[in-house]
Amino acid sequence: MKLQKPKGTQDILPAESAKWQYVEGFAREIFKRYNYAEVRTPIFEHYEVISRSVGDTTDIVTKEMYDFYDKGDRHITLRPEGTAPVVRSYVENKLFAPEVQKPSKFYYMGPMFRYERPQAGRLRQFHQIGVECFGSSNPATDVXTIVMAAHFLKEIGIQGVKLHLNTLGNPESRAAYRQALIDYLTPLKETLSKDSQRRLEENPLRVLDSKEKEDKVAVENAPSILDFLDEESQAHFDAVRQMLENLGVDYIIDTNMVRGLDYYNHTIFEFITEIEGNDLTVCAGGRYDGLVAYFGGPETAGFGFGLGVERLLLILEKQGVALPIENALDVYIAVLGDGANVKALELVQALRQQGFKAERDYLNRKLKAQFKSADVFATKTLITLGESEVESGQVTVKNNQTREEVQVSLETISQNFSEIFEKLGFYTQ
């Protein structure tokens, strides 16, 4: 058997992982500005954590979950999304306690797992960055979180992003709308796709979100959730819209947007951009005020979003956005002869301990091959160290871009390379 990675997974090699590290680091910096702190949860959870919160009738639970019984006969699932595990952690660790500052703001990043057809930007193991805010029902929390997502997408370079906005109202409004939707769709049941015929019985709102052509035709004249909002739900949505307008954030009301998870209420949103004629969702989320109580905690408001890293990187690539990744070496030491081997090891270590990104040759190659490696590494400065340099204690340091050279002692390099680095036109941080 030829050993290969499983279908729907990928190896993220060094050239690509640099982009991943940049995106993750960039997200951390943005989230810190909004006072979010990182939380890390297990990649597997008890099956009920996901099935009960995400919804027993959702595609995630019925079709896409990786679940199994472990050796202790416990029903386990690999996490398919990030919110339910974070809510479980919030409740289990009693972060709702009075002494914990509210609202509680968390972000997470890591792998998720769904058994679905692999395609560009959507794999069976995919990576998600997300945030969750607990303890505030203020519409300003909805807006601040949406604006944070917009801030991240704009600063990282995503172009042509449009904010799609909707509300699912409170449970009473949602129940009234659900019944109206059933009444509307039932006479059209035979025209719906097989999946939507099933959804009509279990979760009719999901029919609105279907990508099947026959379903899109069926819901063209469906009733709007906006006509079923009670006073509380209408006031919340109006406040969100007004605050977005106050901040100069454009949005599109999309009454057919429902999101794929059952726990949402009130505000839901997606950031969508067009790639090669197709609309791609790059970030999505909303409010989920009942989820903490569902996990056994007190009634606690919640709001959050998630975005897929693979899809984000795909969009950046398609839009021609080059991430500002610094891969250059500060110093490369070309080593000539066995007599310079030990000194080269001492020197490269001294440079690293001073904070420089440094490398040396280990393969006893000809100088031409070593200089080629220095160019491949986009090296800023080049040192050639042979037995004669070791004996004299003097060496030439070359700017590998301008070819300017300075003669210095090995002792100076070991103790204060910053001075030489700057003399050759480079600056230390």
From Swiss-Prot:
Any one Gene Ontology cellular component term annotated for this protein: cytoplasm
One Pfam family per UniProt: HGTP_anticodon
Catalytic activity reported: tRNA(His) + L-histidine + ATP = L-histidyl-tRNA(His) + AMP + diphosphate + H(+)
Example GO molecular function: catalytic activity, acting on a protein
UniProt entry keywords in alphabetical sequence: Aminoacyl-tRNA synthetase, ATP-binding, Cytoplasm, Ligase, Nucleotide-binding, Protein biosynthesis
Location(s) in or outside the cell: Cytoplasm
Keyword NAD found: no
Stored InterPro entries: aa-tRNA-synth_II, aa-tRNA-synth_II/BPL/LPL, Anticodon-bd, Anticodon-bd_dom_sf, His-tRNA-ligase, HisRS-like_core, HisRS/HisZ, HisRS_anticodon
GO biological process, one term: histidyl-tRNA aminoacylation
Gene3D superfamilies documented for this protein: Anticodon-binding domain, Bira Bifunctional Protein, Domain 2
Enzyme Commission identifier(s): 6.1.1.21
HAMAP family on file: His_tRNA_synth
Protein family: Belongs to the class-II aminoacyl-tRNA synthetase family.
Subunit structure: Homodimer.
Protein name: Histidine--tRNA ligase
Species of provenance: Streptococcus pneumoniae serotype 19F (strain G54)
Biological classification of the source: Bacteria, Bacillati, Bacillota, Bacilli, Lactobacillales
